[in-house]
Design a protein with these regions (language model features):
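Sec-dependent signal peptide recognition
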Residues: 2-8
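Beta-lactamase-like hydrolase cores
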Residues: 17-64, 83-86, 122-127
């Protein structure tokens, strides 16, 4: 009898000591468990109230996920913290009548979207210009990037001094074809047929489909020699090349366009090239060298040393499947952005209105989702800020990996969960 009573007491004690889930956690957990869509996914969701410091929902929050372009959230934080409001566009030294220059990774020079000409107007009146080569202390491609994407616009090469966004842009309208830069006209074949590839694998030979009212962007293979040639043609004067020398010290800086304008483009349309180059620019600013690996290590060891789960962070854009982040870590980075930027919502796509969220997660009367998407094959993630019906701003990270159904199905089911959080809290 005594033994039975003891067992009953122990069971009661265990039940009373077991942490109770809050109502929102219980409801969301139930929704996800019952969902046929999430049934075979690897799903993680963390919802956090930055005012009360309460974690409202935590489902697999400490597990690692492939973040895809959610990685750009960490690049955003890095750039906001390390890059000045006007981006450093060039470093240079003047000696007698000669100008020696090196790149800082600034992606804006003649970029197809920005078409920034700060560097052009700085250089056009200089008599003797020498580009010091060998400044990129990194690979042109990130680790784990898919080789088959080499001719895709979203996979442009990284470089020390980008020009034209490191892509050939071909616009065909009303029977007229325009090449930018036109240096590649004689290296391009126009074809009425669809070719397997738009560029040769190891050379800058292009195969451009001839389609009316079409714009095509194809990455070109970067080199210091090509950069000096394109600069020479743009400036209509010779730009020489030389290796680094000890007596050439880059003691002056040229500042270019607004950092925040670049960041908004990176986040809203999920521009991989801008993300990669801003990471290199942060490296130039902080470490005086262009090395993506070194600046990531610096950020993880200093600015993000308090993350609960140390990420595996291998590039600036999220193109690599080697990246691994937990939902909790993503929420922590988002909170840092919120704390350090007064206009933080302006950097994020708006549900139902802009960028990668233009057709998804729209509100009823007004937007309620401001978040970054992250898409790779079989993966879709959404991390950012959720405005509840009661007016509270929550931080969330909703990650879905390893599904086989269409992403549209997963997005719709995520919308059901996010609307419940909006309406119930």
């Amino acid at each position: 009898m005594f033994r039975k009573l003891l067992v009953i007491l122990l069971i009661g004690l265990a039940i009373s000591c077991h942490p109770k889930l809050n109502p929102i956690q219980q409801q969301i957990q139930s929704d996800i468990n019952r969902s046929e869509v999430f049934k075979n996914n690897f799903t993680g969701l963390v919802v956090y109230d930055p005012v009360t410091k309460d974690t409202l929902v935590n489902i697999n929050g400490s597990k690692y996920f492939t973040p895809a372009s959610n990685t750009k959230i960490v690049t955003l934080y890095t750039a906001l913290t390390l890059i000045p409001k006007q981006i450093e566009a060039l470093r240079y030294m003047t000696k007698n009548d000669s100008l020696f220059i090196k790149g800082t990774g600034d992606p804006s020079f003649f970029h197809p979207f920005f078409k920034d000409s700060t560097l052009y107007f700085f250089l056009k009146d200089k008599s003797t210009i020498t580009l010091v080569k060998g400044q990129l202390d990194d690979d042109h491609y990130g680790p784990g990037w898919a080789w088959e994407d080499y001719d895709a616009a979203f996979s442009a090469e990284r470089s020390a001094l980008p020009i034209y966004g490191n892509v050939l842009e071909v616009i065909h309208t009303n029977g007229v074809t325009q090449f930018t830069p036109d240096y590649f006209i004689n290296r391009s074949q126009m074809t009425a047929f669809s070719m397997p590839r738009k560029r040769a694998n190891f050379t800058n030979e292009f195969y451009i489909p001839l389609r009316e009212n079409d714009t095509i962007q194809v990455p070109f293979i970067q080199s210091d020699t090509l950069t000096s040639r394109l600069l020479s043609l743009a400036l209509n004067k010779e730009v020489r090349l030389m290796p680094p020398q000890n007596d050439v010290v880059f003691d002056q800086k040229l500042y270019g366009m607004s950092r925040d304008s670049l960041l908004k483009q990176m986040m809203v349309v999920s521009d991989n090239f801008i993300a990669e180059q801003l990471l290199l620019n942060a490296s130039s600013t902080q470490l005086n060298r262009l090395n993506s690996r070194d600046i990531r290590r610096f950020v993880l060891d200093s600015l993000l040393s308090d993350l609960q789960q140390k990420p595996r962070w291998v590039d600036g854009s999220g193109l690599s499947r080697y990246n691994l982040f937990s939902p909790i870590s993503m929420v922590q980075v988002l909170e840092k952005i919120q704390q350090n930027s007064e206009h933080y919502l302006e950097f994020f796509p708006i549900g139902g209105e802009t960028g990668t969220l233009e057709h998804w997660f729209n509100g009823t009367d007004q937007p309620y989702i401001y978040a970054k998407t992250g898409s790779l094959g079989n993966n879709f993630n959404l991390s950012g800020f959720l405005i509840t019906s009661s007016g509270k701003t929550l931080i969330f990270s909703f990650m879905n990996n390893h599904y086989t159904q269409p992403s549209s199905v997963v997005k719709k089911e995520m919308g059901v969960v996010l609307r419940r959080i909006r309406d119930d809290y």
